[in-house]
Each structure stands twice: as structure tokens, then as C-alpha cells.
């Protein structure tokens, strides 16, 4: 954050990148037995993001200076030698007043993370966070809570450790509201009573931008765990969508976009009306032109709004504008920022008339072959959105050519899968070309292919996926694990869809 302040890295809540995978009932702990290459790669991304999150939590707990001192002592003590994890915790123990070793043992040797519920009488209970309908083995953690709460008109702060299923903090019984995650550095989820949530939202400016985003992300997670309803999430979302900070508004837009799995033929018109009414004015205010004065948060907000509205607003004017931007980018790839250009290409190709798809495809591929910069190539080829059989097969065939590197081959297949609500065309092509595709992709991508390509929220798509992978999953090392993850994530999405579709429809109807 010192070298590149424009990236606003300090405002990013890194644990959000770990929470989703770490909530799965099939997740493995960071510290696990490794016997093969797939064991190394299994959960590799989670290990890094969870590890970073835990270290950030420790730094926040003991202070940056003490954290640096502990890390420097650790590096000096073990210079040119080998270490184990306990060596780092021991070094940090020596510069802090906390038993970090005990805390780390649970976080690294157990899968998952805790959910802390704070009752109005000051009773705190912890359980293992899990998604709706999932069955997991319950665990407990030693959890550092950095509390912020309002009592008798004063905002107070304190740090407490809870390591039991139930803990009572009498001081919280008198609180108007409680926020248990100061500066949003904790690796846990939390919930409070509805009355306290209302009071917190009424005093939301007592929190900084990280904390505001954490409230929203936390309630979206509670919805996915079936701990709260759609109305609670929308209450938080609507409050933060009015914030003055573009980073906070962007968080609200991002959470709203996560409800896209509930958008269907029956409610898409109501959803489009909501977007045009509440969010199109904001995009119009920002415009689709990037200026030198725009900071990173404004740029990201514009890109996210444009993507959401372009996908779901069904706005003819926005489509027309997107076609112009896409053609401008194809003529001169330096004339439009890649974030805007990619969305424009997606909207233009998605809304292309029957008979125009081939022309769009050929023009984009021609520009792709001429382009020299990798980011330009990616913007061009991975933004295409076609659903007709001929062009879908052209996109997939392109993945097998020398124009697409082995490392990027799977991403074209992923793009096609995400474009299609019905995966019939995808598996028709895969059945004919699986040998060539699997031979071209790196082994790591072969093992992860089910997870990335075939995870779905459709029972019909999952049935096709299971039929496709059944004869080959044991042939390729690690693929069976990828199938397990695909099945778990797909079934979870379908459970959420079943649980919340009616509530989401009711929310949309209330907005009409």
C-alpha cells in the first residue's frame, strides 16, 4: 500500500477470497497430509488466501510494529535453515501478550471457520459456519473479537477472546448496537439480533469503509447459511448503496449481482425494472468514459455497474452504446479501457441479431490474432457471448488451435459454459473433443476442469456433467476430487435457489 497507494490495497477485505471455499463441507485444513501432486494443488488458492487472512488478523491483534518485530526475529533466528509453522507462532508469541500458538492450531489444523452470534442479553455462541443444508462436523476456535459497541450514548472498544461454545459478556447486554469485527480483520462470520442490526444501520457512519463492506458481505453469507432472509440482506444493501464512498457502493452492487442465480424468465422483467430505476442513474452519472481524475474505486464501480446493467437491465440505449464502444475498441484497442471494452463486447455479441454472430466472431478473432499485448488478447477473446450452436462450437474449436496457449485453453471452455444456461451444446462438443482437449491442457487444469467448467445451478446440467465425467474421472489424477467439488458446489447452489427463490421474487414485486 506504500508503493502503490492508488490500488487501495489496505481497503481490500482479503478474507472474503477465502470464506466461500472454506465453508464447503468437503474443504480440507491448511495443514494436511500431502502424498501426491493433486494433494499439493487441492485447496492451494485457499491456503494462500486463508493464510494471508490469518496473518492479517494477528497483525491487527498485536499491532503492526510488534508483528514486524516478531517476523524479523523469526527470519533472523532461522536464516539459512528450515522451519515448521510452530516456529513462526513461537516468535510472534514472544512479542505479544496473547497465546497465538493455541489460536493458530485451530485455524490451521481444522477446516472452516466460526460463526459468532451475539444475543441481546450479551451471550455469545460460536459454531462452525456452514452453507444452507450442508452437514459439517462442528468445531470451536479461540477467536479474538475486537468489539465496537454503543452504550449510554458512548462508542466503546475492547478486545476479548472466546474459546468456548458459549461466553457471556454482560457489558453487551446494555449495548444499543454491537459490531464485533473492528476494521474487518477477523476470520469469522458474525450475527446480531434484528433490533441491533437496525440500530447499527442507523449509526452506520460510525464504521469505516472496510467495516461497512464487512457488514454487507457478512449478511450475504448469513443468507447463504440460511441464518437470515433476503429482506435482511436487502436492508443492509439498500443502506450502503446510498453511501458517499464508491468502494462501499461497489460492494453493494457486487452483492446485488450475486443474486443473479435467482433471476429467471418469470422475474427478469421486474429485476430489469429495479436496475433501471435504482442503478442506471448512477451509471449515467459516472458515464462510460474514464477520465484521468477517476481513482481506482470509481473505475471499479463503473465497471461493475456496467457489467450488471449490461447483463440484466435489458436497456436498448445501453446496448446501442455498447455496440459503438465494442466497434471502437476493435478498430483501435488503445481507445477504450479494457474493463469497459470487455463488457461492451459481451453486451454487443450477446444482443447480436440472428445471422450477425459469425461476423462478430470473425472480426473479434481477427483482432485477437493481430493483437500483441496479452491483456488485449484476453479482453477480446474471453468477452465473447454467443448461444447459437454454430458460434458456440467456433469458440470451443478455437480453444484447440495454436492461437490459444495450453495454459489458457480451459478458460475458453469456462467462458462458453458461463454463457449457456443449458449445457447441452457444451457436452455435445466435449463428448466429441474430450481427448484433444484433455491432451492439450496442463495436468492441473485437467484435475480442476469439473470444478471450473461444470459447476452449475441446474439439476439438468449437473446430470449431464456427472454422465460426462463418470467414465474418465478415475483415469486422470485428481479429477475425482474436482468432480466432488463440482457436485458439492452445484448442489449447494440448487439448495439456495430452492430456499430463496420465493423470497427474492417477493422482494422484486415489492419494488414495482
Feature-to-residue mapping (PLM):
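Short proline/glycine- and polar residue-rich coil/turn motifs
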Residues: 162-164
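Short polybasic amphipathic segments
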Residues: 143-149
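Hydrophobic alpha-helical and helix-loop surface patches within well-folded domains
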Residues: 1-137, 152, 258, 262-285, ...
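Long, ordered, helix-rich scaffold segments
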Residues: 15-23, 44-50, 125, 134-138, ...
Amino acid at each position: 500500500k506504500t508503493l502503490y497507494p492508488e490500488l487501495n490495497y489496505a481497503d481490500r477485505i482479503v478474507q472474503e477470497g477465502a470464506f466461500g471455499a472454506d465453508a464447503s463441507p468437503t474443504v480440507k485444513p491448511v495443514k494436511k497430509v500431502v502424498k501426491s501432486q493433486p494433494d499439493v494443488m487441492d485447496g492451494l488458492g485457499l491456503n494462500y488466501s486463508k493464510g494471508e487472512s490469518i496473518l492479517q488478523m494477528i497483525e491487527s491483534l498485536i499491532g503492526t510494529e510488534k508483528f514486524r518485530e516478531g517476523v524479523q526475529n523469526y527470519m533472523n533466528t532461522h536464516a539459512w535453515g528450515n522451519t515448521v509453522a510452530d516456529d513462526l507462532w513461537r516468535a510472534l508469541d514472544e512479542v505479544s501478550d496473547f497465546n497465538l500458538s493455541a489460536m493458530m492450531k485451530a485455524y490451521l489444523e481444522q477446516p472452516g471457520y466460526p460463526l459468532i452470534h451475539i444475543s441481546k442479553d450479551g451471550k455469545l455462541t460460536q459454531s462452525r459456519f456452514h452453507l444452507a443444508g450442508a452437514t459439517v462436523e462442528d468445531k470451536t476456535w479461540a477467536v479474538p473479537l475486537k468489539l465496537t459497541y454503543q452504550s449510554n450514548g458512548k462508542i466503546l472498544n475492547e478486545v476479548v477472546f472466546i474459546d468456548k461454545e458459549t461466553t457471556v459478556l454482560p457489558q453487551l447486554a446494555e449495548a444499543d448496537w454491537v459490531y464485533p469485527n473492528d476494521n474487518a480483520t477477523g476470520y469469522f462470520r458474525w450475527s446480531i439480533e434484528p433490533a441491533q442490526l437496525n440500530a447499527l444501520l442507523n449509526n452506520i457512519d460510525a464504521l469505516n469503509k472496510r467495516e461497512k463492506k464487512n457488514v454487507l458481505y457478512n449478511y450475504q453469507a448469513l443468507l447463504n447459511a440460511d441464518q437470515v432472509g433476503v429482506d435482511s440482506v436487502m436492508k443492509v444493501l439498500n443502506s450502503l448503496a446510498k453511501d458517499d464512498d464508491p468502494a462501499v457502493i461497489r460492494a453493494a452492487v457486487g452483492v446485488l449481482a450475486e443474486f443473479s442465480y435467482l433471476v429467471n424468465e418469470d422475474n427478469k422483467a421486474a429485476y430489469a425494472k429495479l436496475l433501471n430505476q435504482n442503478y442506471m442513474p448512477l451509471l449515467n452519472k459516472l458515464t462510460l468514459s474514464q477520465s484521468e481524475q477517476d481513482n481506482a474505486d470509481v473505475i471499479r464501480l463503473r465497471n461493475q455497474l456496467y457489467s450488471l446493467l449490461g447483463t440484466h437491465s435489458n436497456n436498448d440505449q445501453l446496448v446501442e452504446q455498447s455496440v459503438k464502444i465494442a466497434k471502437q475498441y476493435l478498430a483501435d484497442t488503445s481507445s477504450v479501457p479494457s474493463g469497459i471494452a470487455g463488457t461492451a463486447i459481451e453486451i454487443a455479441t450477446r444482443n447480436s441479431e440472428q445471422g450477425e454472430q459469425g461476423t462478430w466472431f470473425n472480426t473479434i478473432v481477427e483482432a485477437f490474432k493481430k493483437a500483441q499485448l496479452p491483456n488485449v488478447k484476453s479482453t477480446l477473446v474471453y468477452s465473447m457471448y454467443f448461444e447459437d450452436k454454430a458460434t458456440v462450437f467456433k469458440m470451443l474449436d478455437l480453444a484447440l488451435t495454436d492461437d490459444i496457449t495450453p495454459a489458457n485453453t480451459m478458460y475458453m471452455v469456462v467462458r462458453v459454459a458461463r454463457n449457456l444456461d443449458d449445457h447441452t451444446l457444451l457436452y455435445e462438443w466435449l463428448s466429441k473433443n474430450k481427448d484433444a482437449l484433455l491432451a492439450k491442457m496442463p495436468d492441473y487444469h485437467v484435475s480442476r476442469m469439473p470444478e471450473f467448467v461444470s459447476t452449475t445451478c441446474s439439476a439438468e446440467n449437473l446430470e449431464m456433467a456427472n454422465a460426462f465425467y463418470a467414465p474418465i474421472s478415475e483415469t486422470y489424477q485428481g479429477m475425482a476430487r474436482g468432480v466432488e467439488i463440482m457436485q458439492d458446489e452445484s448442489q449447494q447452489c440448487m439448495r439456495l435457489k430452492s430456499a430463496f427463490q420465493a423470497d427474492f421474487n417477493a422482494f422484486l414485486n415489492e419494488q414495482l
